[in-house]
Amino acid sequence: YLQRLVDVIVANPPFGGAEDDAVKQNFPAEFRTSETADLFLVLMMYLLKDKGRCGVVLPDGFMFGDGVKATIKKRMLDEFGLHTTIRLPQVFKPYASVNTNLLFFQKGVPSRGVWFYRLDYPEGVKSFTKTRPMLDKHFDLVREWWADKQPIVVEGKDKARFFTVDELVALNYDFDKCCPFPHEEE
């Protein structure tokens, strides 16, 4: 097991899958769930070497989920240095109509807090589709922001903001309340 630890993981685990009891039994009791994406995330956390880094795509359900999801988020803050989350709009249409998130963390480093950045649709774009997919250039503003992370407020709503660990705990680990898309608040 220890020989298979890795320095870097970049992953897009399957969303919405349900694992049976035989698979769940391979995980510590506090992390047992049938949700495939959650189990993949826990596995990635265990496979990282100390100071190993991970970037992972997760569905919005992880952001607001409680129970095992909250336990995973707590562990990410306490021991895995979760530092940045990029909130994405629905980028996988027509295959999946779910908002997704990019989470970045480093094993063995407690989090001081988490930067959240909401990546809105570009001007004039109402959705990404098979014929009009999200492109690398749509991340240009994220890359600019990442180089010098600063809070951003657009029309009175947080687009980018740093949340302390205490603030995230006070939200009961409901990361969905951090820089949500405007239509989600209405």
Where are these regions (language model features)?
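A conserved structural/catalytic subdomain of Rossmann-like adenosyl-cofactor enzymes
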Residues: 1-186
